[in-house]
């Protein structure tokens, strides 16, 4: 099994995916253990002094003015975890919880939090054992970080609350720890606060969304090319010299992908000989511009994620010179903004895909295809309602594009009077990405059927490879009406698994 070594300088997106999705094991580097011990010595020294230090010998938030005596500080740290583990609603997915817990461990290992090495090791042990804290959908305002979700994780480290074992069964956390030989942690000064004061949940979901969107944007380029081909469109608009004069990198990449898929097509431009169509509809002609803008949005979001993965988010932090300082780095705005930005791009990519699908089904705009791609229109309805489903998904995508980060609700007696809502932005983006895969699957279903209905014309080799792979995956081709839901589910699974991209790349080579 792959092992991820956590040091003091952050982790990579690949590390997050390996731990969250592939169950990679975690080890702490010697450098990290030394940094943890050094930072802890600073906190211990401050704890021994009479002067109040936030997070070490004071209350929290609006209660930060109260000095806490030494005999109450362990209770203080336990209490902040228990009181902040106040989430409600459905359980959050296992991979999200593993990502946020791993990212909190990343910050702990930076040597900026004052957490003891043994607490960090327990975090790694819990993840390595496949124990997943039960975290709920609602409870984070994205500032001071993802407090409630991280508190539920810290509660598990204490042997309290519920957690899911490696077999998927939810049991009391204390029982699961004991079953795996893991001792619950006894929190000391600052440790409870340090375990829950970060933007790790929203960052983990950003990293996973970017990984999924990398596949989905390639998939969208492929389905756009298939639709262009099925509509007998002109691929001249994909010429690289046209995109070079408007030098957006994402646009050029999408155009190149579509051109690669359409290379050798006997359908694109077929109409030029007898009835020239100078320009295709915007949803076909401008596909690279829309998908490309989304790709550039992803590039910016990836840069933000890269910076956050190298960051140490806590308050207060232990600085290299030994000072312990309060700060505002827990504010989730940098992550929240790009999560919302991505949701807008995802909604528009879904919207343009739905418009292309509708064009394939409309006999007045499909240039010779049967109504709704039906076998016997009137007796058969074809893919009419598949487009309804797609339209419903796009309607939801548009609602999910409303920014969460534009809202802020004050909390903690107005001490925390501006928050990022980054967790909410991440949750709605996760739903949007999920729905985008379904939207692309419907276009794939329609476009492959339409290509097969162009009898006597030869599709591009890459297109033919996609059609054959889709059929092999159990998605039926043209014919009389049948139960569509299984076909749509099979097309959806085909897209999500990356099989669409793999089928096209078996001819084109790697797409951009």
Curated annotation (Swiss-Prot):
What is catalyzed by this enzyme? L-histidine = trans-urocanate + NH4(+)
Domain of life of the organism in this record?
Answer: Bacteria
Mind telling me where the 5-imidazolinone (Cys-Gly) cross-link is?
A: 143-145
Pathway terms, separated by semicolons: Amino-acid degradation; L-histidine degradation into L-glutamate; N-formimidoyl-L-glutamate from L-histidine: step 1/3
UniProt enzyme class: lyase
The known PTMs are summarized as: Contains an active site 4-methylidene-imidazol-5-one (MIO), which is formed autocatalytically by cyclization and dehydration of residues Cys-Ser-Gly.
Please indicate if the UniProt record lists Repeat as a keyword.
no
Pfam families in the record, alphabetically?
Lyase_aromatic (PF00221)
Q: Which UniProt keywords apply?
A: Cytoplasm, Histidine metabolism, Lyase
Q: Which residues carry this modification: 2,3-didehydroalanine (Ser)?
A: 144
Gene Ontology cellular-component terms listed: cytoplasm
Where does this one sit in the cell? Cytoplasm
GO terms for biological process, alphabetical: L-histidine catabolic process; L-histidine catabolic process to glutamate and formamide; L-histidine catabolic process to glutamate and formate
- EC number(s) for this protein? 4.3.1.3
Molecular function per GO: histidine ammonia-lyase activity
Keyword check for Lyase, yes or no.
Answer: yes
Q: Which family does it belong to?
A: Belongs to the PAL/histidase family.
- Xref: HAMAP family: His_ammonia_lyase
Q: What is this protein called?
A: Histidine ammonia-lyase
Which organism's genome codes for this protein?
Answer: Streptomyces coelicolor (strain ATCC BAA-471 / A3(2) / M145)
Q: What is the lineage of its organism?
A: Bacteria, Bacillati, Actinomycetota, Actinomycetes, Kitasatosporales
């Amino acid at each position: 099994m792959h092992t991820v070594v956590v040091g003091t300088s952050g982790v990579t997106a690949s590390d997050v995916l390996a731990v969250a999705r592939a169950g990679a094991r975690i080890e702490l580097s010697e450098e990290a253990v030394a940094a943890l011990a050094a930072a802890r010595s600073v906190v211990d020294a401050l704890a021994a002094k009479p002067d109040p230090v936030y997070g070490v010998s004071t209350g929290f938030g609006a209660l930060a003015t109260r000095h806490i005596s030494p005999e109450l500080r362990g209770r203080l740290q336990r209490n902040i975890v228990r009181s902040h583990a106040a989430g409600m609603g459905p359980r959050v997915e296992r991979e999200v919880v593993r990502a946020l817990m791993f990212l909190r461990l990343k910050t702990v290992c930076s040597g900026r939090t004052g957490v003891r090495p043994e607490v960090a090791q327990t975090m790694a042990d819990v993840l390595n054992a496949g124990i997943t804290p039960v975290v709920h959908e609602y409870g984070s305002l994205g500032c001071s970080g993802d407090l409630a979700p991280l508190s539920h994780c810290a509660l598990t480290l204490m042997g309290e609350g519920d957690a899911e074992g490696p077999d998927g069964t939810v049991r009391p956390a204390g029982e699961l720890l004991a079953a795996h030989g893991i001792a619950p942690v006894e929190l000391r000064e600052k440790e409870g606060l340090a375990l829950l004061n970060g933007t790790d949940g929203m960052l983990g979901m950003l990293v996973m969304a970017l990984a999924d969107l990398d596949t989905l944007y390639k998939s969208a380029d492929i389905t756009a090319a298939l639709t262009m081909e099925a509509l007998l469109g002109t691929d001249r608009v994909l010429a690289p010299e046209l995109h070079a004069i408007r030098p957006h990198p994402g646009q050029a990449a999408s155009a190149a992908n579509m051109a690669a898929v359409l290379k050798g097509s006997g359908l694109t431009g077929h109409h030029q000989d007898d009835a020239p169509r100078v320009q295709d509809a915007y949803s076909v002609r401008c596909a690279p511009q829309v998908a490309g803008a989304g790709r550039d949005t992803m590039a910016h979001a990836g840069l933000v994620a890269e910076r956050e993965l190298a960051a140490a988010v806590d308050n207060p932090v232990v600085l290299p010179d030994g000072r312990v300082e309060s700060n505002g780095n827990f504010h989730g705005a940098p992550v929240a903004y790009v999560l919302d930005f991505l949701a807008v791009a995802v909604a528009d990519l879904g919207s343009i895909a739905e418009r292309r699908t509708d064009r394939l089904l409309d006999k007045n705009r499909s240039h010779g295809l049967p109504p709704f791609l039906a076998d016997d229109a009137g007796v058969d309805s074809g893919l009419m309602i598949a487009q309804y489903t797609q339209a419903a998904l796009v309607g939801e995508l548009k609602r999910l594009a409303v920014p969460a980060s534009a809202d802020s609700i004050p909390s903690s007696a107005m001490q925390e009077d501006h928050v990022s809502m980054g967790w909410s932005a991440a949750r709605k983006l996760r739903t949007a990405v999920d729905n985008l895969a379904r939207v692309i699957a419907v276009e794939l279903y329609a476009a492959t059927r339409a290509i097969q209905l162009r009898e006597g014309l030869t599709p591009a080799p890459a297109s033919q490879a996609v059609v054959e792979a889709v059929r092999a995956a159990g998605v039926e081709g043209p014919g009389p009406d049948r139960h569509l839901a299984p076909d749509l589910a099979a097309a959806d699974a085909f897209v999500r698994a990356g099989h669409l991209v793999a089928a096209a790349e078996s001819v084109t080579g790697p797409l951009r």
